[in-house]
Design a protein with these regions (language model features):
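Terminal amphipathic helices with adjacent charged low-complexity linkers/tails
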Residues: 145-155, 385-410
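Intrinsic disorder at enzyme termini
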Residues: 405-435
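A glycine-rich phosphate-binding loop feature that marks nucleotide/adenosyl-phosphate handling sites
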Residues: 171-174, 211-219, 380-393, 413-415
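Small-residue-enriched alpha-helical segments and adjacent helix-cap loops
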Residues: 4, 12, 29-33, 65-71, ...
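Short glycine-/aliphatic-rich beta-strand segments at the starts of folded cytosolic domains
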Residues: 45, 51-108, 170-178, 341-348
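A structural signal for small-residue-enriched, beta-sheet-centric alpha/beta enzyme cores
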Residues: 242, 262-265, 269-270, 274-275, ...
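Flexible, glycine/charged-enriched surface loops at secondary-structure junctions
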Residues: 124-131, 164-166, 204-210, 275-278, ...
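Charge-rich, low-complexity segments
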Residues: 1-84
Length: 435
């Protein structure tokens, strides 16, 4: 006989109102015919108890699969009866498997069905998140034996565990070059290069704290890499924005100059765009363009309407000289508050095998420096705030570049010692690049 749902009046309140409720989803899993249904019932009962007592009953521990030191988030239930046994024994363990997604997060619908069925067929709760904040597929709810069984089947599908704990974490990349017209690099190849190079650091935690990679193909930063990753790789270009003047003029004639001025021209952060009053053609002062992506985003949905048949170019498109900008130190609140990434490589081509090796080498320098110099439970951005960006750049072997900063400082009192040496070094580097 199937186990009955517990009475959960406090959780039931969360099902009221117009918005979807996680409680409704858990109840559906609890009454479905699968091996993990009783686990979900007891999880609901534990959560109801927490709402009554205002206490949390989940604690960490150590759970893993053979050969791995990370990738599992252990959760044990501390809610016991008078005899010291689990009050809700089916929820005594509720561990989470972090699974690395494919680069660009490409799945077939059949694969998603197979993963869902496999999870519950091996004792899982059925609760899956696509994807967690680190980019993982989160299979939430399995006991220790179930964790190993589920992992074994996942391996047969070709999946591997992601990172957890003080380690290199699972990376993320946008869909990018696979389907997006804004892409400036092969995002999937960059991510794959980094993951393959540092997989051992992901599966065997040995760092002071977490280290994350994220790759976005343009400054829209769909992966939120500049805010959420220690090494953020963002696609960009360094030549001129490409303008399809024929389609642009059609759009202005149809939408009207007021619409274009209000929604595109006036919203340029550096005011580097202007429209000729007679020809209606667009001019861009590309030297002052900061690649904010607004004009490209505003015109992209209209391209199909104003392009000639057979013309697949955007009204506005990224330039042809494409590459990436690399930032370090992005993170959410921890010790010193939220941080955006700091530019350390203003522009880098990523086309040849040597280019990918250079990114891998730079990432390795960052991880090694982080491992040796960060304090316990300190992210890369916090370490840089503590030791200074100049020391960090010196430690990873990068020269200071004026393009790393948005604008010069306004303080007139500046130290000028070593100014001549640094200026000479800068011009020598420029000559080497030209050569």
């Amino acid at each position: 006989m199937a186990k009955e749902l517990y009475n959960t009046p406090n959780l039931d309140e969360l099902e009221n109102g117009p918005w979807p409720s996680f409680v409704t989803g858990l109840k559906r899993l609890a009454v479905d015919d699968h091996d993990g249904a009783d686990m979900v019932k007891d999880v609901l009962a534990t959560l109801e108890t927490s709402y009554v007592t205002k206490k949390g009953y989940w604690k960490g521990g150590t759970v893993g699969v053979v050969g791995y030191g990370g990738g599992i988030i252990p959760r044990f239930n501390e809610l016991k009866d008078e005899d010291g046994d689990y009050k809700f024994k089916n929820a005594g363990q509720f561990h989470t498997l972090r699974i690395q997604p494919p680069a660009g997060m490409h799945y077939t619908s059949q694969l998603l069905r197979d993963l869902s069925d496999m999870f519950v067929d091996n004792g899982g709760s059925g609760l899956i998140a696509f994807h967690g904040q680190s980019g993982d597929i989160m299979m939430q709810g399995a006991d220790e034996e179930g964790v190993q069984r589920i992992f074994n089947v996942l391996n047969e599908y070709g999946f591997d565990l992601g990172g957890a704990g003080p380690a290199v974490r699972t990376g993320m990349s946008c869909v990018g070059a696979a389907r997006c017209e804004m892409s400036n690099a092969n995002e999937q190849a960059i991510l794959r290069t980094l993951v393959n190079a540092f997989l051992d650091d992901m599966h065997r935690p040995a760092l002071p704290y977490k280290f994350k990679f994220k790759v976005s193909g343009c400054a829209n930063d769909c992966m939120n890499s500049i805010e959420r990753s220690d090494m953020s790789t963002i696609g960009t270009w360094r030549d001129d924005i490409k303008i399809n003047q024929r389609s642009w003029v059609k759009m202005v004639e149809d939408k009207g100059i007021d619409y274009v001025n209000d929604n595109i021209i006036s919203r340029c952060p550096t005011q580097c765009m202007s429209v000729d009053s007679k020809s209606l053609e667009l001019s861009i002062d590309n030297a002052n363009c900061v690649k904010c992506m607004h004009c490209l985003n505003a015109t992209s949905p209209l391209t199909h309407k104003y392009n000639d048949i057979g013309d697949f170019s955007g009204i506005l498109s990224p330039g042809d000289d494409k590459g990436v900008t690399i930032c370090v130190g992005g993170k959410r609140t921890l010790k010193i508050g939220d941080l955006f990434g700091t530019v350390v490589v203003p522009f880098m081509k990523v086309e040849t095998e040597e280019d990918y090796e250079a990114i891998e080498e730079l990432a390795g320098e960052m991880i090694d420096f982080f491992a040796e110099n960060a304090l316990e439970h300190e992210r890369t951005g916090e370490m840089i705030e503590r030791i200074g960006i100049v020391n960090f750049l010196e430690g990873i072997g990068l020269d200071v570049d004026p393009n790393m900063i948005e604008s010069p400082r306004y303080m007139s009192y500046v130290r000028m010692d070593k100014w001549d040496e640094e200026a000479t070094k800068w011009f020598d580097n420029k000559k080497e690049q030209v050569a």
